[in-house]
Amino acid sequence: MMNTKLNILLTSTLLAGLSCNLYAAESSPKEMLEDALSAAPPTLKDKVTVLDWEKNVLQKGDSRYTCFPTPPQLEGKAPMCMDEAWMEWADAWMNKKPFQAKTIGISYMLAGDQGASNIDPYAEGETEENQWVKEGPHLMIITPDQSLLDSLPVDPNNGGPYVMWKDTPYVHIMIPVGER
């Protein structure tokens, strides 16, 4: 299990460069905690560590998961809970660094999200070409062996799991578990 200091260090790296004042001014710690916990399954809610975007601990947990409220720059909801592998993934994605998973990683977004391109990890809005998807409650999985993803569809409208961001270092499996 990752120790708390290393977890906070990774989280600090993950959050570098984000503006926090807007979200902090609009949301109380209780609201941010509730938002972050809405991403977690019921069996983990009392076990996860929850951090706000200023790295303040809103809840200290003893599991391998760290949850965050919706990022301040996003409209709508998009809280997520990440294990250690996903924390590394998020750091790489946010800092546009190469990434190769060392282990299987699982991330929860059980409150859903407000949308992302299925093909471009850095798209900021919907276009006709970028397969914009507003996903309901879902899990995300990364794997060290990307060839395992070849058996899965890339079409987000196939009615089941699909591969997002194929042919990028940030490729992962999306597993919808509820209505969009």
Question: Over which residues does each language-model region extend?
Answer:
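Primary mode marks residue(s) on the alpha4-beta5-alpha5 output face of response regulator receiver
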Residues: 25-180
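Bacterial N-terminal signal peptides that target proteins for export
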Residues: 2-10
